[in-house]
Swiss-Prot record:
Gene3D superfamilies: Zn peptidases. It comes from Acinetobacter baylyi (strain ATCC 33305 / BD413 / ADP1). InterPro entries: AspA/AstE_fam, AstE_AspA_cat, Aste_AspA_hybrid_dom, SuccinylGlu_desuccinylase. Binds 1 zinc ion per subunit. This is Succinylglutamate desuccinylase. One of its GO terms (molecular function) is succinylglutamate desuccinylase activity.
Length: 325
């Protein structure tokens, strides 16, 4: 059996590109992309992706263990499954990305950039996901969980971001995030160029980006911290009932504004080490620059993904408001 992660790290593409066993058939679609289809009927088609940012290793390790357990029959495959390691070159070098953030390349975003290995990869991943869903059972419900870890610490360590879509968010998706003991869920207010927005908007999948702690090198992750999300992913693959939640109720936030860096003098009014979900009160200055300041207009708001070092014209953070319980 070819190991999923090893095939990427060693750049050794499997000799057999497809095959089957007693339970399912499998086909390698690309480097770090494999499709598994059970012999019996199924009601769900699920994409699990990690490594869109190459230094976010814990989710990659989770997918490797799931891959091994499915092939060893210690995890029963009762759904059609596409496993994706997103950015092989960045995974091999331990970098977030090589030239440009791949999670801003989807929904055709790669077309606005100079061609590179990563733009080509983003385009192919879009194609693989579309083909995966189109070739699956027409009545199967579609899901996509894109797994990440964050650059900075967070007051709410684990959270999901749901793309802004026209259709209502799927109840099973929301229930699975709750069962995974995530601390929070964030609802976007505008379209994006993320992998999960692509699968939601272009493939009609119930999709989410999951942030599961902080990025660490391979071998330095404490996977015991990811037991809850791992359990839920395995339950989804086996198509079994979701487990109960074991934490305080999940908190819900909505994005009310994006902070855009427009000028060279742009500054955020918080320390560089400030965690995600840092709090601002009404009247607080969140960010300053010559052309526009950002001030908290609500009683309490929080900031997500603050980054003063982005290029001009890019998002330097999200302003969140907590939704009523």
């Amino acid at each position: 059996m070819t190991h999923f992660l090893h095939s990427v790290l060693s750049q050794q593409f499997p000799h057999a590109l497809q095959g089957e066993n007693h339970n399912f058939s499998w086909q390698w679609q690309d480097e770090g992309v494999i499709c598994l289809t059970p012999h019996h009927g199924y009601e769900k088609s699920i994409v699990l992706s990690a490594g869109i940012h190459g230094n976010e290793t814990a989710p990659i390790e989770l997918l490797e263990h799931i891959y091994q357990d499915v092939f060893q029959a210690s995890l029963t495959l009762n759904v059609r499954l596409l496993l994706v390691l997103g950015n092989p070159n960045a995974i091999r070098t331990g970098q977030r990305y090589i030239e440009y953030d791949m999670n801003r390349m989807f929904c055709g975003g790669y077309q606005q950039l100079e061609p590179s290995v990563e733009t080509q990869r983003a385009e192919r991943l879009e194609q693989h996901v579309q083909i995966f869903f189109e070739q699956g059972c027409s009545t199967a419900k579609r899901y996509h969980y894109d797994l990440h870890t964050a650059i900075r610490a967070s007051l709410l360590p684990t959270f999901a971001l749901l793309p802004h879509l026209e259709h209502v968010h799927d109840p099973l998706l929301l229930n699975s995030l709750n069962a995974a003991d995530l601390d929070a869920v964030v609802f976007h207010n505008t379209a994006g160029k993320t992998f999960s927005h692509f699968s939601g908007a272009y493939c009609q999948a119930a999709s989410a980006t999951l942030e599961l702690g902080q990025a660490k090198p391979f071998g330095q992750n404490d996977l015991s911290q990811f037991v809850a999300i791992d359990r839920v992913l395995r339950v989804l693959i086996a198509d079994e009932a979701l487990p109960s939640r074991h934490k305080t109720p999940i908190r819900r936030f909505k994005v009310i504004e994006s902070i855009l860096k427009k000028d060279d003098d742009f500054q955020l009014n918080l320390k560089s080490s400030a965690p995600n979900f840092s709090l601002f009160h009404q009247g607080d200055v969140i960010a300053t620059q010559q052309s526009q300041n950002y001030i908290a207009h609500e009683h309490e708001v929080r900031i997500l993904f603050p980054n003063v070092n982005v290029a001009k014209g890019l998002r330097a953070g999200l302003i969140l408001q907590e939704m009523s319980k």
